[in-house]
Amino acid sequence: MAGTHTLHVATRKGLFTIRREGRGWQIGEPDFLGDNVSAVLSDPRDGALYAALDHGHFGPKLHRRAPGAEGWEEVMTPAFPPKPDGVEDVDPMSRRPIPWTVMRIWCLEAGPRNRPGELWCGTIPGGLFQSHDAGRKWELIRSLWDNPGRKQWFGCGGDFPGIHSICLDQRDGRKIAVAVSSGGIWTTEDRGATWACRGKGMRTSLVPPERAHDPGIQAVHLL
């Protein structure tokens, strides 16, 4: 949603903008026609628009359209650091090695109003990234990536786990919550210095019964 009269819809066939005109809605010319748009963000702070593309074999791309601009510019795509030698990182269900490579940008979120240019990004595999300059540079939040609880996350509907929801508390910028499929809900109250898994009371049917209530492996779909 971009304002009260405009919708931006990301689809496998492009990015569609739908505007309210009179008593009806009008679909404009699509952007990135024929491309898989995996995420879209309309920044409520300045009106910039961000679109993440999933090019399959050729990898993800991220584009930004400045407020009032006609065209798009490609900005930096988040990237993992090289995987250290000797580190074992596998999906606990499939036993497949988890690549330290961004396969898909799954969600984008704007930072607080008092921090212009701050963006957050969730990826497959389950990385959380932050940018301070409108997507020109990205930093992996190592405190979550290196958390021992991440080793329990597994792919649900995809080959690998991923972060699909990021919620920032606009009243307190230190508080952030992210949701993982499948890996539960994780929250921080110190801007990512430390994380806690929140999911007591949830239940999943994707694992053996004795682990159904484990908060760290819940198949959260949206937050």
Spans of model-derived segments:
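Extracellular glycan-interacting surfaces
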Residues: 1-223
